[in-house]
Amino acid sequence: MKKVIFLIYVSLFIFNWGKAWALIEVDITRGNLNPLPLAVSPLSVDQNSKEKFKNLLKLEDIGVEISKVVENNLRQSGLFNPLDPKAFLQKPDIAHVKPRFEDWALIKAQALITGEVKIVDEKLRVEFRLWDILAGKEIMALAFTTVSENWRRVGHIITDK
């Protein structure tokens, strides 16, 4: 009887030995992350500031240029899918104050970046806001003041925030 019990223990040990040392192998073939669709509205610029920037920096519309920097940075990250500005239903100067969330939801945007550019004491002042379209509320608002030549850097800083 002792031999039978011993053989049962030995056989259980031998047959389970391989399972105890088995390695789990997982193959990850692709990610499951869809880029977030967001709208980067051109930053609004009042006419007086637009003329000053045009003379100072030789740019037609500094608000559009800063928005392009932000849009390109977000696209290159792979985490965001900036929507085509031609699809936007709301004008940038109105969207900055209070976006019509229904309009942005129609074009499938889940987030919105708006802003305003102006000259204050001969310096560039950029205000930007990040909006959650689905929740219908502002997530973040920041303002930067710098020399006009740093306009591109401001676009990169907005992206980093």
Where are these regions (language model features)?
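Sec/Tat signal peptide C-region and signal peptidase I cleavage site
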Residues: 16-22
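Envelope-exposed proteins and targeting segments
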Residues: 22-24, 34-39, 66, 70, ...
